[in-house]
Curated annotation (Swiss-Prot):
InterPro entries (UniProt xref): SAM-dependent_MTases_sf, Thump-like
SUPFAM superfamilies to which the protein is assigned, alphabetical: S-adenosyl-L-methionine-dependent methyltransferases
RNA-binding is among the record's keywords: no
Name of the protein in its database record: Uncharacterized S-adenosylmethionine-dependent methyltransferase MT3122
Similarity comment: Belongs to the methyltransferase superfamily.
Domain of life: Bacteria
Keyword NAD tagged: no
GO terms, biological process: methylation
EC code(s) of this entry: 2.1.1.-
Keywords assigned: Methyltransferase, S-adenosyl-L-methionine, Transferase
GO terms assigned for molecular function: methyltransferase activity
Organism: Mycobacterium tuberculosis (strain CDC 1551 / Oshkosh)
């Protein structure tokens, strides 16, 4: 290949490999042509929002004029192209800006793009979407002040404007509040993983909602404006492990109330009920015992368990290490839910041997 393309060969190989990686992450943005014509850098692809998440955000911005002030390679603009009245983009990096222009042209989209620093706004009445850099040299930044730009200066600069800021899912909600943010925090999950926490300024927030969980796999959303009258009782027939977006958004009680479930412990995210709500994955309780490895091994052996999905909350147990120690030799796939119940001197660890619903 080097004989044919010379010094360009490494760049061609890298572009080909990046396009293959991008197909699963961004393919939905361009269903007709795919991403086979797009340009990337490795870091830009890592930072790019997955297509389903970008499209979800675009639906919330339908009918608006939107300015993606950190447009990078054009992912959000591609998602907005059929929903926003107008979408414009800017970025401080001229290379990524050129890539965005190329990528959007591959979709037949003539985008309004310019080079600009996000801290120096170039639009007035548009909704501004901002994705501060959370990686540097492949390493993640976890503190809000370490974002580039930092979240505090961003919120100060756009105070009073309609703004959407993408953040890491593990952000400290209280710290965000101390920065003066008064809108909605939306936690988004996709394919079973929590992808991001998105800040929606007050003018864009749902009515009365400060926290929202959006589960893209099922299309379900729940907010803190819903009832949270979820009781605490011993396990019923089923145990439900709520989606990570629900847990991260602090909406376990609201989720339980919606689905007619209760908590096993007020500080633990597991829910339970005597019937499994439609479309939810659950674990049918077969046996319940005080956690003891030897006793657990005996119970699993008696149930012919050969593979165990192990879920743990509230106690320092490594599921993979425990699975190896159990030495299961049966033929039946089961699940073990291990959790702390109670607090202080009254707390105890309970194991539930279950049959997964799917």
């Amino acid at each position: 290949m080097r004989a044919r393309f010379g010094d360009r060969a490494p760049w061609l190989v890298e572009t080909t490999l990046l396009r293959r990686r991008a197909a699963g992450k961004l393919g939905e943005l361009c269903p007709n042509v795919g991403v086979s014509q797009w340009l990337f850098t490795d870091e830009a692809l890592q930072q790019a929002t997955a297509a389903p998440v970008a499209r979800h955000r675009a639906r919330r911005l339908a009918g608006r004029v939107v300015h993606d002030a950190t447009c990078s390679i054009g992912t959000e603009l591609a998602a907005l192209r059929e929903l926003a009245v107008r979408a414009v983009g800017s970025d401080i990096d001229p290379v990524r800006l050129a890539m965005a222009r190329h990528n959007l042209a591959a979709l037949g989209m003539e985008a309004d793009l310019c080079r600009a620093d996000v801290l120096h706004p170039v639009t007035r009445d548009a909704v501004v979407v901002i994705d501060p850099a959370r990686r540097s040299n492949g390493r993640r930044r976890f503190h809000l002040a370490d974002y580039q730009p930092g979240l505090g200066p961003l919120l100060d600069r756009y105070r009073g404007r309609d703004v959407v800021v993408k953040c890491a899912p593990g952000i400290d909600f209280e710290e965000v509040g101390r920065l003066g943010f008064e809108g909605e925090i939306e936690v988004i999950s996709y394919r079973g993983g929590v992808r991001e926490a998105c800040l929606w300024s007050a003018g864009l927030a749902g009515s009365g909602i400060r926290r929202r969980a959006s589960i893209l796999d099922s299309g379900e959303q729940i907010g803190d404006d819903e009832p949270d009258d979820c009781g605490v009782r011993p396990a019923g027939k089923w145990i439900v492990d709520p989606d990570g977006a629900v847990v991260r958004a602090g909406l376990v009680r609201n989720y339980g109330a919606r689905h007619g479930l209760w908590q096993l412990d007020p500080q633990i995210a597991y829910l339970s009920g005597d019937r499994l709500p439609p479309a939810l994955r659950g674990f049918e309780v077969l046996e319940q015992l005080a956690f003891d490895e030897r006793r657990l091994r005996q119970v699993l052996s008696a149930l012919d368990c050969g593979a165990a999905e192990i879920l743990v909350r509230g106690v320092a147990i490594d599921p993979d290490a425990l699975r190896r120690r159990l030495r299961l030799r049966g033929s039946r796939p089961l699940a073990v839910v291990i959790t702390r119940i109670g607090a202080g001197s009254l707390s105890h660890v309970t194991a539930y041997v279950c049959r997964p619903s799917r």
